[in-house]
From Swiss-Prot:
Recorded catalytic activity of this chain's protein: heme b + (2E,6E)-farnesyl diphosphate + H2O = Fe(II)-heme o + diphosphate
Top-level class of the enzyme under EC nomenclature: transferase
Residues spanning the membrane: 38-58, 60-80, 109-129, 132-152, 159-179, 184-204, 222-242, 254-276, 299-319
Xref: Gene3D superfamilies: UbiA prenyltransferase
Annotated source species: Paenarthrobacter aurescens (strain TC1)
Protein name, as recorded: Protoheme IX farnesyltransferase
Source species, domain of life: Bacteria
Keywords from the named record: Cell membrane, Heme biosynthesis, Membrane, Transferase, Transmembrane, Transmembrane helix
EC number: 2.5.1.141
Location in or out of the cell: Cell membrane
Gene: ctaB
Function, in words: Converts heme B (protoheme IX) to heme O by substitution of the vinyl group on carbon 2 of heme B porphyrin ring with a hydroxyethyl farnesyl side group.
């Protein structure tokens, strides 16, 4: 890391005082540290991947173990991230109300909570699914906390490209939970999310560019002009859509998935090119950038819903 992080228990904001909040508010503060919206997005890919790998519904016990274990792993990584980044979170309007900044949770409490969630996630995946999924869960935590948060985030504009790989682990965990191995279709889904991350996150960093500049975090959307960022968004969007279609020959996907991948991909490419056109004309706005950000979430959701439905309708277009 390029910036020192205090390890004391002194809150970054003196209000509210420790012990002055009720149980309900404390619970909400702990929940906020886990970044529940990020967890929701990660879980969108987990169950559909399990269904596709099984070519049907896995057992309820396996589904619950994988979803809960995966959520705990993501939550643990989120809390560690909030703990490490609490010095810069106070400098950004987007993150200034996080519990470690307001003092609702102390750094020591957050650190203990992160370790508990991490240990619980590995145990749940190990005994509820299999050791391979547990190792992948541990890998996801380490990758997000060490590779992204501690090494890349404050040092390079490519931080979200490589650090974002941690967000691709849920599909590997899901596939491994069902098959006890990692096969090529899982790798393709991993790469879809890997290529999806930049066009998802960079428009957000355009919207909050001033925040990142104040915190000296070199997100591409904050340090490069809209023209440069929009080109990168378009390139990654095309690569993502092309990669998604590999599930047809590699994963044996059928017509439901194929139609969704083509239609949703075409729509997202249109939105990406619209952002590019506005940026090249010097007419890009925060609203336009956020439209692509929200559109990327809709794209991924539609793609994985189709992945879940596909095994129940028709057969593979190309041999399985």
């Amino acid at each position: 890391m390029t910036a020192a992080v205090s390890t004391t228990d002194t809150p970054l904001n003196a209000s509210p005082a420790r012990g002055s909040i009720g149980i309900s508010r404390k619970f909400k503060a702990y929940l906020a540290l886990t970044k529940p919206r990020v967890i929701e997005l990660l879980l969108v890919s987990t169950l559909p991947t399990m269904i596709f790998a099984q070519r049907g519904f896995p057992s309820i016990g396996l589904i619950l173990a994988t979803l809960v274990g995966g959520a705990f792993a993501a939550g643990s990584a989120g809390v560690f991230n909030c703990y490490i980044d609490r010095d810069i979170d106070k400098l950004m309007h987007r993150t200034e109300k996080r519990p470690l900044v307001t003092g609702e949770v102390t750094p020591r409490e957050a650190l203990v909570f992160a370790w508990i969630l991490g240990a619980a996630s590995i145990a749940i995946l190990w005994f509820g699914a299999n050791p391979l999924s547990a190792w992948l869960g541990l890998g996801a935590i380490v990758f997000y906390v060490v590779i992204y948060t501690m090494i890349l985030k404050r040092r390079t504009a490519q931080n979200i490209v490589w650090g974002g790989a941690a967000g691709c682990f849920p599909v590997l965990i899901a596939w491994a939970a069902v098959t006890n191995t990692v096969e090529w279709p899982a790798i393709v889904l991993f790469m879809v999310i890997f290529l999806w991350t930049p066009p998802h996150y960079w428009p957000l960093s355009m919207r909050y560019g001033e925040d990142y500049r104040n915190a000296k975090v070199p997100m591409l959307g904050a340090i490069a002009g809209a023209k440069v960022v929009s080109v990168q968004v378009v390139l990654y969007a095309w690569a993502m859509v092309a990669c998604s279609l590999l599930m047809v020959p590699v994963g044996g996907a059928g017509w439901v998935y194929t139609i969704a991948a083509v239609a949703a991909g075409a729509w997202f490419l249109y939105e990406s090119h619209a952002l590019y056109k506005r940026a090249q004309g010097g007419d890009v706005s925060n609203k336009g950038a956020m439209k692509v950000f929200h559109g990327s979430i809709s794209y991924l959701t539609l793609l994985f819903i189709a992945l879940a439905v596909d095994p129940f309708v028709g057969s593979a277009i190309v041999g399985s």
